[in-house]
Structures are given as structure tokens and as C-alpha cells.
Amino acid sequence: MEISFTRVALLAAALFFVGCDQKPQPAKTHATEVTVLEGKTMGTFWRASIPGIDAKRSAELKEKIQTQLDADDQLLSTYKKDSALMRFNDSQSLSPWPVSEAMADIVTTSLRIGAKTDGAMDITVGPLVNLWGFGPEQQPVQIPSQEQIDAMKAKTGLQHLTVINQSHQQYLQKDLPDLYVDLSTVGEGYAADHLARLMEQEGISRYLVSVGGALNSRGMNGEGLPWRVAIQKPTDKENAVQAVVDINGHGISTSGSYRNYYELDGKRLSHVIDPQTGRPIEHNLVSVTVIAPTALEADAWDTGLMVLGPEKAKAVSYTHLRAHETVLDL
């Protein structure tokens, strides 16, 4: 199903976004106190803003959130050798490999959006990510050779991965023994959506939850207004706001090349790898922000658009996202 109400921000200036719990002007109604819970997961931070819950409920909820996120990390991590994902990666078997419904859904969404971005969003790019030192392995001491890059590219490709649904059981199947799936590009989005489902299960209908750069929300904030997200430029000394958007009931995610990088042989190397070249991206698009029905979808789309660069990303967003607004800040 196409996304008919997505807003895409394609920015050639560095961006980040934070949840806004307050209206930019005084509220006309009595405000409800917003409790903010925070913690760590997946090498990043999580946050939940919830109006109108007491201290006892907050403590109980924080424990449930952390437990769930720890389980998500155990499902998706490439840093934990005993994670569900790494057990699949380490297996040389070409037979269907049983996985959870959650894993199958994440991979299905990733493959779908990967196809719509002409392979730019590629969850099999892990060998290249590791080669360039952005995975569990250490950074290289020199720029990888073309031979090394080609060898790793031969182990990648969305066409080598299939999701199978049979008799209430889901499977992943690869046709390359060394295929390595890396879900770090969509893990935060999935976890944010999972937190939103936890809020619903707990009877909470007003919340803003985030994991890393992915957010999901529902209902009104403490001022009785829709949740709003400020998109800012971290390179701006004044932290000027690029845009403020309402995300009520939607997911939002950002991908950027400005935070996770290192310099080697005089070159600045981004963690965003282009599956076509096998190298870090070199274009001038620094960040992409996407609003979509779910944070998982937004997380997948922003990665693909980030890889494509400003011109191709703009074309793809209009073709597949039917975007309401595209912003280029050059």
C-alpha cells in the first residue's frame, strides 16, 4: 500500500529532531503534567513522554519499557552473537530458517521499501558496513581496496533474501551462505512502534515515544494539543528550528551522515553505505526526515532516500511517497 500522507524533508544541512511537549504559546486550558521516562537501548537512548501518570505507575512502566527494549535488542542486534538475527547470519544453511513474526514483518517491510528505492535501502549491506568499520568490527587502518569492496558486494543483494509464511510460522531463507542481514537501519523504527503498542496495551492513549532518531505518538500532549516535533540544525550555533511538524498518530525518523563518521587518509567517511558502489556516500545530502504511518516505514524510507542523494531522493519521494512537501536546503 502506498503512503499517501507522508512529508519528506530532504536537507543538505545537518538536522536532528526532538519531541516538543509544549505549545509555542500559552495554552488556553489547564495543562496536565507530562512524565518523561528515559533509558538506554541499542547503543542509543529511548524516551517516553506521557501525560497524567503517577510516580508508582511511572516506575512500573519504565521497567516494562526497558524489558521490552532489551528483548528487541536481543532480537535484532548484530553486536550480540547470540541474538536471533546473528544466529541466522552465522548459519550457512540455505533452508528456510524459522523466525518470529516480528522479524518477518521487519524484513518484509525492508524488502518492500528496498525495491521502491532501487536497492538503495538494502538490509544485506552488512558485509560492506563491517568492511568500512561501522559494524561490530573495528575501523580499517586504510581505505579498503576495490578488490575488498567487490568481494563484500558479492555477498550482498536483496534478491538473495526471502520471507516465507507457512502455517502460522515465518521463515527467512537466503540463497547465499554468507548473506549477512543488518537491521540497524530499521531497528530504532521498529522499537519505537513496539513501544507505542506497549502504551496501548497499558491503556495509555496519550504518549510520545522515541528510540534514537525514530518516534511514534498518539493523542494530545500535556497542553491538550497534538504532539509536535522540532527539526533543528545541530551545526547552527543557535540551534535554529528548521521546521516544526505535527506527528499525531504517525511515525517519524531521520537519517543523517553528520554524526556517525570517521576520517581516514584525509577523507571523511560516513556510516551510510551505498550498496551500488560499496562505499560511503559522497553527495551533499546530509540528512533526511520522513513522516510515515509507522516509525518502521519512516526509518526504512529515510535510509533509502539518504543513500540516493538529493535529486534521486526527491524523484523517488514524489513517485512512491506522493509527498505533501519536499524541502531542499542547499
PLM ranges: what are they?
Residues T6-A9, D329:
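Intrinsically disordered, low-complexity repeat segments enriched in small/polar residues
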Residues H320, V327-L330:
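Single conserved hydrophobic/aromatic residue that forms the stacking wall/gate
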